[in-house]
Amino acid sequence: MQLEQIVEQAESAIAAADSPTALDEVRVEYMGKKGQLTELLKGLGKLDPSERREAGQKINEAKQQVQTSINARKELLKAAELAQKLEAERIDVTLPGRHSAVGGVHPVTQTIRRIEQFFGDLGFSVKEGPEVEDGFHNFDALNIPANHPARADHDTFYFTPSTMLRTQTSGVQIRTMENEKPPLRIISPGRVYRNDYDQTHTPMFHQVEGLMVDTDVSFTQLKGILEDFLNHFFEESLTVRFRPSYFPFTEPSAEVDVMGKDGKWLEVLGCGMVHPNVLKAVGIDSEKYTGFAFGMGVERLTMLRYGVNDLRAFFENDLRFLKQFN
């Protein structure tokens, strides 16, 4: 068969191929190991040497022409296949969108972040510590005597007589004062544990405590910072009172109340000036340095901010409840 005829047939077969598979069959038919053009190359040895070179050149040119046509047809088939696929998968952008089901930040976490942001702007750093504490950091260093009710089994979860789940994050303050020198400004958010469970108490809850130790720290500073914090947290100008109270680790001590919308006082946190015995327990000169401390229950603040009546709702993971905060 003449070379021109083979090329013409190949071109026709290529043009008729309507799929990559059919096109590959054409390639094998003409360019494969036993293809028609390949067989012509194998037959060059039978030609006279004077004709061999010219014949070989023509066959190679024919192969190149056929291969170029195959490549061009392959690109056309790919483009057609892509266009068909895009048409089949076309999205109608005029249709209404679907809302993605996304999670939200737990209201307790929102409150902690809000507290951290406020005190962070005042130069307080965030410190953390172990939730399993020893007696020294949880009680002794805080001027809590051995006969204090807080150390009783019915209030504290003990592992051994000397190790327990922490009942407040004050241990973080003690560890900070042991390892760092004044001036100090820290807050210590975290989980704490007490053996209590009712509408306003759970065995595990979150607390944020604050500590400032420096020269000439006064109750006036403490009062101003806490009043600013409460107005910022509740986003309104509140009536605040500091009611005298007692804590072993502060002297003087106070409970902080705010006036509710119903005209009744609501307790929100406790505070006071750091007791000299606490400073002495961690090696800080109580004649040179003074300090204040405060502590607040995160869940209680969250309840007051959002009008939640039962603290236990924060831990029941009811999405109908939690979605209200996001």
From Swiss-Prot:
It is found in: Cytoplasm. One of its GO terms (cellular component) is cytoplasm. Its cofactor is Mg(2+). It catalyses: tRNA(Phe) + L-phenylalanine + ATP = L-phenylalanyl-tRNA(Phe) + AMP + diphosphate + H(+). Its EC number is 6.1.1.20. Binds 2 magnesium ions per tetramer. Keywords: Aminoacyl-tRNA synthetase, ATP-binding, Cytoplasm, Ligase, Magnesium, Metal-binding, Nucleotide-binding, Protein biosynthesis. The keyword Transmembrane helix does not apply. GO terms for biological process: phenylalanyl-tRNA aminoacylation. GO terms for molecular function: ATP binding; magnesium ion binding; phenylalanine-tRNA ligase activity; tRNA binding. Mg(2+) binds at residue 251. InterPro entries: aa-tRNA-synth_II, aa-tRNA-synth_II/BPL/LPL, Phe-tRNA-synth_IIc_asu, Phe-tRNA_ligase_II_N, Phe_tRNA_ligase_alpha1_bac, Phenylalanyl-tRNA_Synthase, tRNA-bd_arm. Belongs to the class-II aminoacyl-tRNA synthetase family. Phe-tRNA synthetase alpha subunit type 1 subfamily. HAMAP family: Phe_tRNA_synth_alpha1. Tetramer of two alpha and two beta subunits. This is Phenylalanine--tRNA ligase alpha subunit. It comes from Idiomarina loihiensis (strain ATCC BAA-735 / DSM 15497 / L2-TR).
